[in-house]
Amino acid sequence: MKRTVILLGIFLAVWFAAPPVRAQNRPLQTPDADIVPTGILRVQGGFDFLQNMDYPLSGLSGDLTSYGVLNMRMGVGRRVEVQLQGTVQNFLQVNGQVPAPVTPVLTGANSTHDVGDFSLWTKLLLRREHRAPAVAFRFGFLMPNTNQARGLGNNATNVYASLILQKHIGRLKAFGDSGIGILQSPNAKFSQNDELLYGGALVYPLTSRVSVMGEVSGRYSSRKLTPALYGTESRGEGRMGLVVSGGGFEWDVAAIAGVYPNDPSTGFTFGVSRDLRLFGRQRP
């Protein structure tokens, strides 16, 4: 216990002492072409609330609250960045249930919870922005951390790859990605669903400390949704929010609206970001 307290104290000391280095990625989900500076760990955490989520694989529907929505990005070279994403805990207030391939074991009378799936990513900057847009390539995989018996996950490993374009038009930053996602079909043997990944986002700084932003991002399946494909259905979100710099942190909030029938009707997210220098010297 004493060792845990000491380690926590060291982490907090580094967190509050480290100078900010233009930390901004939340609350958007569309990846940009920027690479975090070498030796910098960008730590982002948040809270999500989504209304009327549907889970065809388990037949559950309800309001989802996500605690500890983590995104950690680290620059390991001038053109290379690694990233870890995931959620510490998801809680679903169950408002409805229909027959489905997986019969969930609820953890409460009308609720269920479990750790979220985590993903690992690598991003490579292929071309810096000049007159032509910046170009980056991003690939990664999703790990099956969530137990499908809880009704919130697929217990499947998915692979993703996408190409990112980014261009500044005056003060406006525009970027987007397009690629492919190879998703395991959890309800069918030896089957997968190849889907289109997409995203488009705009960021505009109102002042040196306040920026507004919006996006539409998700994945699209051209196949008809059958029980064999439950868990690989199309998913997408639109987000509109702002980021405020203060006290060495980046504070963000955004409204959320779903794109497809199984997506949340409405929701919001709130979070904070901070850059920590782990190694290397800060440029004067």
Predicted regions span which residues?
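Serine/threonine-rich low-complexity intrinsically disordered regions
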Residues: M1-K2, D275
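Sec-dependent signal peptide recognition
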Residues: K2-G9
